[in-house]
Amino acid sequence: MGKPGLMMTPGTGWEEDYHLGANFAVIPWEYSLFGDFSEQNTTQFYSVRAGFSSFMEVNLSIAHRPKMADRIGVGDRQIDFRFRLLEEKKYQPALVIGLSVPGSTSPVMHHDYLVLSKGFKTRYGFLKANLGYGSPLVVRKLSGKDNFFNSLHLDRKEDIRSGNYLNGLFGGLSYMPVSFGGLMLEYDTRTWNMGGFLKIKNRFYAHIFNFEASSSWGISFSAQFPLDLKPKSLRDAKHNN
């Protein structure tokens, strides 16, 4: 859903060398946050991520629904912040908190969460486990109110359209038997999903994933870029001085 992570769940991944990222994903209508039987509209997610420090990132996501473009335009937009509270160490998991900016009258893409992860090297490859908790509450903007702060209202996620997604405990596993790809399994509090991914030099990623062992598939592509355009060797030398 435009957030760094596995397939449909956020993770703790943090790109130290590539502070700018772009992502494109296609989610089938029956598993998108907006899908219902009357709409049947595949959702396209576009997102841009920017890291401003070693502990903070901002993410802009757009959910575009092609069949409704003439009525709603580009689509729903959401700004999220990620904060790295703990960096992974030998005996310490990584810990990240994600917060969505409130203010939407239809907060389908509003998700606050806490997630931790730990990686394990094995003789058969690299295994990483994620465990997180999605807030059951969202802040919604009531229409017809002139004052922004007076218009904010706290709702239960189950009362809005995306109610079962990232509502409570979620988690997942990724397994890399080789350096250029691997397999994924996750539970997003709504569905079980599984898939695979390929990567090229930590810069380009391609994912394909399946929902609930059904005929519905999603895909995503992402790319990472350094804000400092100097060669990596020069950037490393600068950090070491």
Language model region names:
Residues 1-111, 117-127, 135-140, 149-157, ...:
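Transmembrane beta-barrel domains of Gram-negative outer membranes and organellar outer membranes
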Residues 37-40, 113, 117-193, 199, ...:
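Outer-membrane beta-barrel transmembrane domain signature
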Residues 53, 57, 176-178, 201:
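Residue-level recognition of beta-strand termini and adjacent short loop/turns
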Residues 192-234:
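Predominantly the C-terminal beta-signal and adjacent terminal strand-loop region
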